């Protein structure tokens, strides 16, 4: 009987620690501008003018290290502002992480669906990065033997995506792993088909997914570029299938077809690592992930009119987040799992490290159940 898997993770507190957001006043912003006008103008989607006045009167704003409570305080060029957002309850999120592999340079975690990797949007504390800080940063023996106080993720998985997440424990490991990921993307851009299909590259990534509809071909190669469009609720823009986008390469293998439920269980190997690549590529070929709240056939978002995008609808950068009316990339509901990763041992590149994350039942074939 094999021992139970090692896990890390501490329960989330009811409230997070709040956040501090810093601004520096330029000469153009300082001309007859009050502190309330500055925040309302720059962060309109965070709160109306009255809301900013209340925050100022509540003592949540500092100018050059001093708390100000007068909303009509004039700003000067060069002033340093700090807005302290009060602690709040973040949405419910899993916290336990299974350790799949660990050596002196690398730790591979099995990320559960629903847990965000890095802070952003509604999730500022409830992230994988926070758990790494808590679980390793407080370990005196770890701190004493490492260049970094805790491991750091070297790539991202979507919040709704589960499976293997690689985290570097040293600066050298972070550099090497980042180079492996970058190499895969550069090979796609070079048009080298042999290497795109798996020959000669250092990092291999295989996913398991449940696609809507029946994929009739046993193997499908997708080379649809992925670009960015403006989209409400996504400050940096939304990734979609776009002829003007950057090269992306995915290879899809059908494992099982369920004609009764009208879905296909597929294995997907990706060479590049564009954000949401598998979701976009499967949707582009007419088979979006089952339960995907965002992407539909064609690799585009549901019910989206780019002419109606309003900048004020984006998440506020200061933390006063509003839930958008339309689906955003972090929404869950789909079934996508980073199942296998192969890469060279970082100390001995002649050895290959193969990491496998156990499959969720819904992504197992009949023989695997």
Curated annotation (Swiss-Prot):
S4 RNA-binding domain: from which residue to which, for each copy? 47-104
The cross-references to Gene3D superfamilies, in alphabetical order and at most eight, read: Pseudouridine synthase
Q: Which UniProt keywords apply?
A: Isomerase, RNA-binding
Q: Give the domain of life.
A: Eukaryota
Q: Its Gene Ontology molecular function terms?
A: pseudouridine synthase activity; RNA binding
Q: GO terms for biological process?
A: pseudouridine synthesis
Instruction: Kindly state which reaction or reactions the protein catalyses.
Output: a uridine in RNA = a pseudouridine in RNA
> What is this enzyme's EC?
5.4.99.-
Q: Which family does it belong to?
A: Belongs to the pseudouridine synthase RluA family.
Q: What is this protein called?
A: RNA pseudouridine synthase 5
């Amino acid at each position: 009987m094999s021992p139970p898997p090692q896990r890390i993770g501490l329960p989330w507190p009811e409230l997070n620690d709040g956040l501090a957001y810093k601004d520096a006043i330029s000469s153009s912003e300082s001309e007859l501008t009050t502190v309330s006008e500055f925040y309302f103008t720059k962060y309109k989607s965070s709160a109306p003018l009255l809301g900013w006045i209340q925050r100022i009167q509540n003592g949540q704003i500092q100018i050059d290290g001093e708390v100000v409570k007068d909303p009509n305080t004039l700003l000067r060029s060069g002033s340093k502002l700090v807005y302290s957002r009060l602690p709040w309850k973040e949405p419910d999120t899993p916290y336990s992480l299974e350790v799949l592999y660990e050596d002196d340079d690398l730790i591979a975690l099995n990320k559960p669906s629903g847990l965000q990797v890095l802070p952003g949007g509604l999730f500022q504390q409830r992230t994988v990065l926070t758990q790494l800080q808590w679980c390793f940063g407080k370990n005196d023996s770890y701190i004493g033997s490492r260049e970094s106080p805790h491991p750091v993720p070297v790539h991202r998985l979507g919040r709704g995506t589960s499976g293997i997440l690689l985290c570097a424990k040293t600066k050298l490991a972070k550099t090497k792993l980042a180079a492996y990921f970058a190499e895969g993307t550069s090979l796609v851009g070079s048009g080298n088909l042999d290497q795109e299909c798996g020959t000669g590259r250092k990092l291999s990534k295989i996913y398991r997914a449940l696609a809507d509809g029946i994929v009739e071909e046993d193997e499908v190669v997708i080379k649809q570029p992925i670009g960015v469009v403006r989209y409400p609720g996504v400050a940096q823009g939304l990734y979609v299938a776009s002829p003007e986008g950057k090269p992306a390469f995915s290879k899809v293998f059908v494992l099982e077809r369920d004609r009764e439920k009208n879905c296909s269980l597929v294995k997907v190997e990706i060479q590049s690592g564009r954000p949401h690549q598998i979701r976009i590529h499967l949707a582009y070929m007419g088979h979006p992930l089952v339960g995907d709240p965002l992407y539909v056939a064609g690799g585009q978002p549901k019910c989206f009119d780019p002419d109606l995008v309003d900048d004020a609808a984006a998440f506020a950068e200061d933390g006063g987040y509003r839930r958008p009316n339309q689906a955003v990339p972090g929404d869950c509901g789909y079934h996508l799992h980073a199942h296998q990763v192969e890469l060279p041992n970082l100390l001995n590149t002649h050895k290959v490290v193969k990491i496998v994350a156990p499959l969720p039942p819904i992504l197992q074939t009949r023989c695997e159940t």
